[in-house]
Amino acid sequence: MTEIKLRIYEFKIFDKVKEFHAEIQAYSKSYSYSDEGPEESVVLNKDGLDGYKLISTFQLGYSDLFEYEFDFFIKYLNEDFTSEKYHLFRNNCRHYAFNLIRILKPTRGYIGVKILQDLNDMSEVLGKLIRGFLLVVIIFSVGLCFLPEVYKDYLLILVLILLYKQ
């Protein structure tokens, strides 16, 4: 039996927007995922490294899975979590940690699942807001450059509608 821990770190995107990084500790190693691909390391705490700030560590209980069984599962999981498939909001470290919890099935894994689902929901909302804002800026900029003066009021109404729907 091995103890399973979920670590949540805070870091900043563009030195402004808070984002959260998740990693799983099992078998005396840390497992995480980033834009560089899956990472397995003996460094069990990234606090202070590369702008990471440890927010919390959650004890998820113990797993009955042997390490060699876990290694077998993680080999196939890593095929879906390559550096090319990384996406800040849709395929990230929290999704990776979520899948690791599903494989390990720790005794209190439901805690980690709930935390990761909530963080992913927050991240998806942030992603939608950023995409919506960029879309509005692009439409507004193009409209101001090319539309005749008569249609610029309608452009403003369209932008307000798009902002409201986000």
List PLM regions with ranges.
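Non-catalytic ligand/cofactor/substrate-binding and regulatory segments of enzyme domains
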Residues: 1-91, 100-107, 115-129, 156-161
